């Protein structure tokens, strides 16, 4: 009896500002823990990871997944390309004399497929090593003027006293075959093409690494007299000022031809990857 009173009294004692709470009962140890229903913890064999005797969860096959997705989306999947093939483009390569336009063109011809290099018609005499129909179509002055009269040329110009022009038919035929077109023209021809084609063509300006390097190349060609060299160098200085009218500039440094050609290829790849493609009509 006394023990009960003491217990009751101890539960109600409150020290000043410090109440003491004595629990009425203490947690009891878990009884019969070993007797918990094994069936409530046991996983079936088919759900035990790593169990060699478990059956793999059956997943739908790829065709079944596709059919299910199509049904839920309400439309069928198509194997057609997400985007159409890129348009054919016209690449205009130009630059002053002595920058290596022909070297870049010839190397590009070796390493890049899907390009047609337009052969320009000219009234000038053939130089040593040149091949008619490959380097130029060599025609007489009268023949050239006849082509002009019949509107067979996309553009033409009088350069250093000789005519040069681009045949239309050649471009149309190869674009119809799906090939991109490369035009190698002088600065005057590039200006004319810019007026005709506007922004539908890609204009690349080739330059040497320095003016001195450009002049040395002209001298090394040994195709002009001193007076002719003077005219070409003076003209080249003027032509460099037209760089701002081009889309891209590529430096063709001595001994770095591959680098220049790689740059031109990168430009072509970038143009073919544009969301808004250029459209050429000739």
Swiss-Prot record:
<keyword id="KW-0067">ATP-binding</keyword>
<keyword id="KW-0150">Chloroplast</keyword>
<comment type="function">
    <text>Required for normal chloroplast development.</text>
</comment>
<comment type="function">
    <text>Essential for recycling GMP and indirectly, cGMP.</text>
</comment>
<feature type="region of interest" description="Disordered">
    <location>
        <begin position="43"/>
        <end position="63"/>
    </location>
</feature>
<dbReference type="InterPro" id="IPR027417">
    <property type="entry name" value="P-loop_NTPase"/>
</dbReference>
<dbReference type="Pfam" id="PF00625">
    <property type="entry name" value="Guanylate_kin"/>
</dbReference>
<feature type="active site">
    <location>
        <position position="232"/>
    </location>
</feature>
<keyword id="KW-0547">Nucleotide-binding</keyword>
<keyword id="KW-0934">Plastid</keyword>
<keyword id="KW-0808">Transferase</keyword>
<feature type="domain" description="Guanylate kinase-like">
    <location>
        <begin position="88"/>
        <end position="269"/>
    </location>
</feature>
<keyword id="KW-0809">Transit peptide</keyword>
<feature type="binding site">
    <location>
        <begin position="95"/>
        <end position="102"/>
    </location>
    <ligand>
        <name>ATP</name>
    </ligand>
</feature>
<keyword id="KW-0418">Kinase</keyword>
<dbReference type="GO" id="GO:0009507">
    <property type="term" value="C:chloroplast"/>
</dbReference>
<feature type="transit peptide" description="Chloroplast">
    <location>
        <begin position="1"/>
        <end position="53"/>
    </location>
</feature>
<dbReference type="InterPro" id="IPR017665">
    <property type="entry name" value="Guanylate_kinase"/>
</dbReference>
<feature type="active site">
    <location>
        <position position="221"/>
    </location>
</feature>
<comment type="subunit">
    <text>Monomer.</text>
</comment>
<protein>
    <recommendedName>
        <fullName>Guanylate kinase 3, chloroplastic</fullName>
        <ecNumber>2.7.4.8</ecNumber>
    </recommendedName>
</protein>
<feature type="active site">
    <location>
        <position position="127"/>
    </location>
</feature>
<comment type="similarity">
    <text>Belongs to the guanylate kinase family.</text>
</comment>
<dbReference type="InterPro" id="IPR008145">
    <property type="entry name" value="GK/Ca_channel_bsu"/>
</dbReference>
<feature type="compositionally biased region" description="Polar residues">
    <location>
        <begin position="51"/>
        <end position="62"/>
    </location>
</feature>
<dbReference type="InterPro" id="IPR020590">
    <property type="entry name" value="Guanylate_kinase_CS"/>
</dbReference>
<dbReference type="GO" id="GO:0004385">
    <property type="term" value="F:guanylate kinase activity"/>
</dbReference>
<dbReference type="GO" id="GO:0005524">
    <property type="term" value="F:ATP binding"/>
</dbReference>
<dbReference type="InterPro" id="IPR008144">
    <property type="entry name" value="Guanylate_kin-like_dom"/>
</dbReference>
<dbReference type="GO" id="GO:0048638">
    <property type="term" value="P:regulation of developmental growth"/>
</dbReference>
<feature type="binding site">
    <location>
        <position position="252"/>
    </location>
    <ligand>
        <name>ATP</name>
    </ligand>
</feature>
